[in-house]
Amino acid sequence: MPTINQLIASPRVVQKSRKKVPALQQSPQKRGVCTRVYTTTPKKPNSALRKVAKVRLTNGFEVIGYIPGEGHNLQEHSVVMIRGGRVKDLPGVRYHILRGVLDTQGVKNRKQRRSKYGAKRPK
């Protein structure tokens, strides 16, 4: 506990809360170019090959984005749109790549939750 004199000399500094998605810089989405597309394995109780991409954003940030859904057409130099949202079992993955936007195709044969995966309405 500081004394009154200590508080007069240097007042209390308000702690800034850390941002969960700093690379977006307050934007809802950001555009970027894939620099590497690869698979990685999740944390302990889970087991899979999760598809992720390293993306260089238009503001210069380099982030890792998760590619949701079954199958994808992304490769190096693909232009993608990124949104916030982490993947709990992949450390360091704090962004999602939007499906059906720019170079990313929607998920084929998707019947439910289509808007999340950029899939058109089946005929």
From Swiss-Prot:
GO biological process, one term: translation
Protein name from the UniProt record: Small ribosomal subunit protein uS12
Entry similarity comment: Belongs to the universal ribosomal protein uS12 family.
Molecular function (Gene Ontology), one example: structural constituent of ribosome
One GO CC annotation: small ribosomal subunit
Organism expressing this protein natively: Rhodopseudomonas palustris (strain BisB18)
InterPro entries on file: NA-bd_OB-fold (IPR012340), Ribosomal_uS12 (IPR006032), Ribosomal_uS12_bac (IPR005679)
PANTHER family per the UniProt record, alphabetical: 30S RIBOSOMAL PROTEIN S12 FAMILY MEMBER (PTHR11652)
Keyword Protein biosynthesis (UniProt): no
NCBIfam families: rpsL_bact (TIGR00981)
HAMAP family per record: Ribosomal_uS12_B (MF_00403_B)
PTM sites of type 3-methylthioaspartic acid: D89
Assembly mode: Part of the 30S ribosomal subunit. Contacts proteins S8 and S17. May interact with IF1 in the 30S initiation complex.
UniProt keyword annotations, A-Z: Methylation, Ribonucleoprotein, Ribosomal protein, RNA-binding, rRNA-binding, tRNA-binding
Key word Ribosomal protein present: yes
